[in-house]
Amino acid sequence: MVGQMYCYPGSHLARALTRALALALVLALLVGPFLSGLAGAIPAPGGRWARDGQVPPASRSRSVLLDVSAGQLLMVDGRHPDAVAWANLTNAIRETGWAFLELGTSGQYNDSLQAYAAGVVEAAVSEELIYMHWMNTVVNYCGPFEYEVGYCERLKSFLEANLEWMQEEMESNPDSPYWHQVRLTLLQLKGLEDSYEGRVSFPAGKFTIKPLGFLLLQLSGDLEDLELALNKTKIKPSLGSGSCSALIKLLPGQSDLLVAHNTWNNYQHMLRVIKKYWLQFREGPWGDYPLVPGNKLVFSSYPGTIFSCDDFYILGSGLVTLETTIGNKNPALWKYVRPRGCVLEWVRNIVANRLASDGATWADIFKRFNSGTYNNQWMIVDYKAFIPGGPSPGSRVLTILEQIPGMVVVADKTSELYQKTYWASYNIPSFETVFNASGLQALVAQYGDWFSYDGSPRAQIFRRNQSLVQDMDSMVRLMRYNDFLHDPLSLCKACNPQPNGENAISARSDLNPANGSYPFQALRQRSHGGIDVKVTSMSLARILSLLAASGPTWDQVPPFQWSTSPFSGLLHMGQPDLWKFAPVKVSWD
């Protein structure tokens, strides 16, 4: 990856990190006796493989080697030809809003060693970003700053039981490709955490994952539903809060098929990394298995997170997979969220991306062991089935999957895509059975069309504006669209004032007045909105390339700036003050 160079602001950042760490450690000592084993402060970078006292470079490359005689993994700078795993990080966040991570493993070593080493080397090149992302987003979750003891103990017990059940399944099904991939996923996470903590030791046989360690960085989506299922009473999710917009668009004459996604999130999550993994994993645990179809992948992500979480993936199998969150508003369904018999969503999406070569297979793999957490509408685009300039193949180009607790519905939507020329996704289920079961009918009855599939603001804006998409640039413009002060479709009739920054393809809830009146929480002023856009095409996906812009939209509204915003007091380590970045083309050597 060739990117602009970026140097960390050494002394200022160091002071901020020192203050935050000191406070975290003091509070950890105060609350530790009351709530053992829960999350909180993690050590600042400076483990045995870190360069103590040095400002981290804008670009860093490292390799993990196997010392056969000593039976140990060793870290060296640069890319070594005999590496078990290697990684290169280019930090261009100050220039583009993105860091770029490229990571690969060697098929000369077994899958388990590759997976663990992949986690080890990722932490080694990105430890400063991991620390800052943790402090920005996770340090307050279940201590030491603030916590809800009953909920946190229930969450810890749930995760421990779930990890134990998965360990039992891995041991009971040693020949299973599915459980082989689950094990590799957890080993990669184990390597990431061990490396960051400076205690690398490849686990032979059974191994453990801390329930509230770096697992929390993977769980941000699953936690949205675990909080409700486990009766968290403080700081519940905002009713109606959007989480991503997506558009799949056939260009005129079926000349191309564009796939676009923007992530909606809290602005403290804007330390962003676009990652490329090239993992030489086999489908099953034995050497005669072929490589997984999705062994090459590019995805938008975050420091310390080994999957997308947005989610947006371009896969070497010819698939592009993405989702928007639909959630669950029916409390009666939380009974299906159980620690045993389920695999949490972040793991299932990794496994499906690796093993599937078409949409139907992806759906079959993903829906196994439905956890009922991180409930999403998934779109699986298969570019292998798309014929540029040709008629509809009838099937396989677009598969739609929707998950809620106790239910997964799948359908091929290729014919509908070709009939309408687009598929839009905006956090509302498209399947009537899912819509009704998830409790949205009651919200429509209470609040009107804002919660309906056809009448919500984004449904109407997509329907009106999708025909304006003629190429990559116009797709980016639509996905960054927010003209809430002038667009009648952005009005909230029950709000005062009526124009609302949430009612757009890329939300800017920070622009809503703090003293306004709003019928539900999502329409209020919040440090939340669309924080990126990613777009690919048939030709770009073939080479794992995309266009990407980072940060809240600033096309029709002022750019977001921390120092002048109502949220300047929120921790945002490592982030630029002013978010005003143009799209960049992401390509790889």
Swiss-Prot record:
Reported modifications of this chain: The p76 protein is synthesized as a 80 kDa precursor which is then processed into a N-terminal 32 kDa form and a C-terminal 45 kDa form.
Designated name of the protein: Putative phospholipase B-like 2
Stated family: Belongs to the phospholipase B-like family.
Disulfide bonds: C142-C152, C492-C495
Origin species: Homo sapiens
Disulfide bond in keyword set: yes
Assembly with partners or alone: Interacts with IGF2R.
Sorted UniProt keywords: Disulfide bond, Glycoprotein, Hydrolase, Lipid degradation, Lipid metabolism, Lysosome, Signal
Annotated gene: PLBD2
Task of the protein: Putative phospholipase.
Any one of the GO BP annotations: phospholipid catabolic process
Annotated glycosylation sites: N88, N110, N231, N436, N465, N515
Signal peptide bounds: 1-41
Known tissue expression: Ubiquitously expressed, with highest levels in heart, brain and liver.
EC number(s) on file: 3.1.1.-
Subcellular location: Lysosome lumen
One cellular component (GO) term of this entry: lysosomal lumen
A GO molecular-function annotation: phospholipase activity
